[in-house]
């Protein structure tokens, strides 16, 4: 089974509408909703009747404003409530201040689940992470504890350990794999060695993902060439395959969750967002 997922759903009304077009006119089967977006209620209302669309809570600890009181989560956000935009900072704090971080992670993750849960319109709870932060062991541990304390069970949690073997089979495409993405892939796979115990605790089967090594370059030419190998990889291991994409074009400067001129603003206005949108329309 292959899931075609759009991350970052609901950052703006236009961005959410463009993602929904990938559902109505393309092959999209799931979205990951940004819990701290002011447009979340509107975006979720627009998909409330589409019961077969998978909807995940896109746990976000790096972009926009926290949902907790800023003074309650000082390791995660500045005094104005804006998240520190750093995966590596979270990773470092998980080593240097594990107890304080665990308390604050639980508080913010609980707040984000609480905001999205009533808007799921009867769907089961699904979880993943913005910038794949759920792969940090401390974050996944906090997710486990929040679910346990709330008496919740997730029907799916994304496992962002992407296999490299399907990429290596296509030597003609190697130049299309940004070296920094290969490094990120290896980092996430390494973190997975320490995080998988928490997946077991939650009764989660580790699935497969595609799209990390070519993140920012998920155009139809590459995806159509690589997807069959990823599907064979997943089928052989009886895993669900999730194609992770960001087709939400249309976020204008100053409209997103990030501060104007921030690192995420450049990502949303990148032409690659439109290419990923086009890819989902063609697959």
Predicted regions and their residues:
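Active-site metal-binding loops of divalent metal-dependent hydrolases
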Residues: 8-9, 131, 247-249
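Terminal accessory/targeting
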Residues: 1-3, 13-126, 136-283
């Amino acid at each position: 089974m292959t899931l075609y997922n759009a991350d970052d759903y609901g950052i703006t009304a236009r961005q959410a509408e463009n993602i929904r077009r990938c559902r109505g006119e393309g092959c999209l089967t799931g979205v990951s909703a940004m819990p701290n977006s002011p447009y979340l209620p509107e975006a979720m209302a627009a998909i409330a009747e589409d019961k077969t669309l998978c909807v995940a809570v896109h746990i976000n600890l790096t972009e926009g404003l926290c949902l907790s009181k800023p003074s309650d989560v000082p390791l995660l956000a500045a005094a104005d409530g804006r998240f520190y935009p750093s995966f590596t900072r979270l990773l470092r704090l998980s080593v240097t201040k594990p107890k304080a971080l665990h308390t604050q992670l639980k508080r913010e993750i609980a707040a984000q689940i609480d905001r999205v849960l009533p808007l799921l319109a009867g769907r089961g709870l699904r979880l993943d992470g913005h910038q794949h932060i759920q792969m940090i062991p401390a974050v996944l541990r906090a997710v486990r504890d929040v679910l346990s304390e709330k008496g919740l069970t997730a029907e799916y949690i994304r496992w962002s350990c992407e296999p490299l073997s399907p990429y290596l089979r296509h030597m003609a495409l190697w130049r299309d794999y940004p070296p920094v993405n290969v490094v990120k892939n290896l980092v996430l796979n390494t973190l997975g060695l320490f995080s998988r115990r928490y997946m077991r605790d939650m009764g989660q089967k580790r699935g497969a993902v595609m799209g990390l090594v070519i993140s920012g370059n998920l155009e139809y030419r590459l995806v159509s060439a690589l997807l069959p190998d990823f599907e064979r990889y997943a089928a052989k291991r009886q895993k669900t395959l999730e194609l992770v994409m960001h087709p939400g074009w249309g976020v204008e400067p100053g409209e997103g969750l990030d501060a104007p001129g921030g690192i995420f603003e450049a990502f949303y206005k990148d032409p690659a967002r439109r290419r990923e949108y086009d890819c989902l329309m063609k697959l």
